[in-house]
A protein has these predicted regions:
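Membrane-entry segments of alpha-helical transmembrane domains in multi-pass membrane proteins
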Residues: 2-15, 31-38, 42, 77-95, ...
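N-terminal signal-anchor/start-transfer transmembrane helix
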Residues: 14-29, 101-102, 236, 240, ...
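Transmembrane helix-loop-helix hairpins at membrane boundaries of multipass inner-membrane proteins
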Residues: 1-9, 27-122, 195-219, 225, ...
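Hydrophobic transmembrane alpha-helices and their helix-loop junctions in integral membrane proteins
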Residues: 102-146, 152-485
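Membrane-helix interface motif
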Residues: 59-65, 193-204, 398-410, 511-541
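Alpha-helical transmembrane segments and their helix-start/interface "positive-inside/aromatic belt" motifs
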Residues: 33-46, 172-184, 379-388, 444, ...
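Aromatic-capped, Gly/Pro-kinked transmembrane alpha-helices
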Residues: 61, 76, 81, 493, ...
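Hydrophobic alpha-helical membrane-insertion segments
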Residues: 43-58, 181-194, 388-396, 498-522, ...
């Protein structure tokens, strides 16, 4: 029997981290450093515990879909704050609050000696509040508020080291690129509002058939297709899909804890969640789905290639995020929304683990992020080593780890799809399995195995070996850390405990969740629509997968007969051979394939293209408008009018000679002119 969740309990979930954020931010000096982290952790812990309760209540049949605050009415349009809590929302709430809680605890150790300690805790709690408001919304207005709020807070966090020029450039880049996506997102919302007459999900979904029948006058463009593509452009910005991906690697300029929160559970997952929530609309447009599939495939494969040439440990993990987001997007495109959400969940745990593990390595290495200066750390950082190995195994899709179940399910769904673009997508996601394993275990072997390179002089191109600091996490610099050549060391318990707690779901959550989420009734009983996630009968991939599914054990055992597991193994073996067995080979390969390496090292020149075409292009257009539009036209009208009046006044002044006969002559000429005019007109 369906029951309604308690409204006050739901309100407490986003308000608890908001309260912690406000106290730490506005009264940071009064509460002190300990007070700031205690009050924000308490707020997020309350949100997590209440989210867990809501999750179990929803599993028992409870739900909620109602307005909690009416802001204003504009004609027949209602602007409201409301919550829609179903299985999708409840799962997202648990993931967001749990990962956020781990990041909050981890931050105590990682940011221990930073001057902006209270400010940072305030920001990450505000980030949690923003994401909760986004996933809990039941209308497009609140969705857009949460959407913009996570963008704003990410701007503040990426630019946390605001005295560093590279950080300011990175947060401005993230802000501007996301504005491009948000413009498309706003257009999509505007189209739905204009033709559906409502911002409430349920009311818009109820008119989906009517919307699908509409076309723009004089074109074959379906209204719903255009609206869905516009909505997805918003997702391309938030979830960093090609070509709006360029901001995400530069977000590494922020402290490592926020990198984990952005990449694992908040901002970049917002686009995936939004498209899944809008499945009743997207299912009516194969054109939009094909567009999504191709964009996701490009991102999954080509962003993975960039991870191979990175030397900054955080940037390797960042490019893995881009690639995995591509996987999720491909799943959305082939109508496997539950699989996309499933991978979103498993990815949140192992990606947070990998980022926080990278931060632990950075702390143990006295703030060095260059993997060329590491090696052999497993002896010095055993907990970080084991947990990072767990995260890497989950990332590459090792059988029985969580990432295996979600990633292989995506590959199977793409294989069974018949949408245009699915053939290319299948090639991309399969090839990306090898690429993912290669860059993941390149990182793992360079950091934890092999020669102890930290005993040698720093690599001349690394941030620690030269004056340039681009991409370097300045955590703790100048705040009392002992930066001289000590051996690496394991980090404090407050840092490694979150790693252990994240490692557990990175192993087991896939096996636990695959059956109910993909082949059970987890997404069946909807509130705003018939089903939480709707899949049309013309997209049967998931239904066909269900026929072949024989439990999580059977799936793991059966994987040895499939291509992906062997590609992953091949990637690991190649990484071992190149970076442990024959470490001199990568330099030779780089010289042999110089142009390709240069292309990858310059990130396909996307930053250069954006700078030349958009940045300089905008400046050139602005300069042209200023010179031709402002100076010539506008100033010409204003100054030209003044000059004309001056000239005319000069002419008039010439006529004012002061001689009476001049005036008499003018009067006579005038009278003759008037008489001539009257006679002429009278004759007609």
């Amino acid at each position: 029997m369906s029951t309604t969740l308690n409204e006050n309990l739901l309100l407490a979930i986003p308000l608890a981290p908001l309260a912690g954020s406000l106290i730490a931010g506005l009264f940071g000096n009064a509460v002190g450093r300990k007070g700031a982290h205690r009050i924000t952790i308490l707020g997020v812990m309350i949100a997590f515990l209440l989210s867990a309760k809501v999750f179990f209540d929803v599993m028992g049949g409870a739900s909620f879909n109602a307005t909690v605050y009416e802001w204003m009415n504009v004609g027949s349009l209602k602007l409201e704050v409301g919550f829609l809590v179903d299985s999708l929302t409840a799962m997202m709430m648990v993931v967001v609050t749990f990962v956020s809680l781990m990041v909050h605890v981890y931050t105590i150790g990682y940011m221990a000696e930073e001057d902006g300690y209270q400010r940072f805790f305030s920001y990450i709690s505000l980030f949690t509040f923003s994401m909760l408001m986004l996933v809990m919304s039941n209308n497009f207005l609140q969705l857009f508020f949460g959407w913009e709020a996570v963008g704003l807070v990410s701007y503040l966090l990426i630019g946390f080291y605001f005295t560093r020029e590279s950080a300011i450039y990175a947060n401005m880049k993230a802000f501007l690129v996301n504005r491009v996506g948000d413009f498309g997102f706003l257009l999509g919302i505007g189209l739905l509002l204009a033709f559906a007459g409502s911002m409430n999900y349920g009311e818009v979904f109820a008119k989906r058939a009517e919307l699908a029948s509409l076309h723009f006058p004089g074109t074959d463009w379906g209204l719903l297709t255009v609206a869905c593509i516009c909505l997805f452009i918003g997702a391309m910005g938030k979830s960093a899909q090609f070509p709006l991906h360029v901001w995400l690697p530069d977000s590494m300029e922020g402290p490592t804890p926020i990198s984990a929160l952005i990449h694992a559970a908040t901002m970049v997952t917002a686009g995936i969640f939004m498209v899944s929530r809008m499945s009743p609309l997207f299912e009516l447009s194969d054109t939009a789905l094909s567009f999504i599939t191709v964009i996701g495939a490009i991102t999954a494969l080509f962003m993975g290639f960039l991870g191979i040439v990175q030397n900054d440990i955080k940037r390797v993990v960042a490019y893995s995020t881009l690639s995995q987001l591509g996987y999720m997007t491909v799943a959305l495109g082939v109508s496997a929304y539950p699989v996309a959400v499933f991978h979103l969940m498993t990815h949140a745990f192992f990606k947070a683990l990998l980022f926080l593990g990278a931060g632990s390595v950075i702390m143990g290495m006295h703030h060095d992020q260059d993997m060329r200066n590491m090696g052999g750390l497993r002896k010095y950082m055993p907990i970080t080593w084991i947990t990072s190995l767990v995260g890497s195994l989950a990332l590459i899709g090792t059988p029985f780890f969580s990432g295996f179940y979600s990633k292989d399910s995506i590959i199977d769904a793409v294989k069974l799809s018949h949408l245009p673009g699915s053939g290319f997508a299948y090639f991309a996601v399969v090839a990306s399995v090898f690429v993912t394993a290669l860059y993941s275990f390149r990182m793992y072997f360079l950091v934890f195995h092999g020669e102890e390179r930290f005993r040698k002089p720093k690599h001349p191109e690394s941030p620690m070996g030269m004056a340039a600091t681009h991409g370097h996490d300045d955590h703790g610099h100048g705040h009392g850390h002992d930066d001289h050549a000590h051996e690496p060391h394991e980090t404090p318990w407050v840092v490694w405990v979150p790693l252990v707690l994240l490692a557990i779901p990175s192993v087991i959550i896939g096996a636990i969740a695959i059956s109910p989420m993909l082949f059970g009734d987890f997404f069946q009983h909807g509130v705003a629509f018939d089903k939480v996630i709707f899949i049309g009968e013309n997209h049967p991939a998931l239904a066909e997968m269900a026929e072949e599914f024989h439990g999580w054990v059977g799936m793991g055992l059966h994987s040895v007969s499939g291509l992906p597991v062997w590609l992953a193994l091949a990637g690991v073996v190649v990484a071992w051979f190149l970076y442990l067995k024959r470490p001199e080979l990568p330099a030779s390969i780089r010289r042999a394939f110089g142009p390709i390496y240069t292309l990858l090292d310059n990130k396909y020149y996307m930053d250069k293209i954006n700078e030349v075409v958009f940045a300089r292009g905008s400046v050139a257009i602005g300069r042209g408008l200023w010179k031709e539009g402002d100076v010539v036209v506008i100033d010409g009208l204003v100054n030209g009018s003044a000059r004309f009046i001056g000239w005319f006044a000069g002419v008039i002044r010439f006529l004012q000679s002061g001689y009476i006969y001049h005036y008499a002559f003018a009067m006579i000429i005038g009278m003759l002119g008037l008489l001539t005019l009257f006679v002429t007109l009278g004759g007609k």
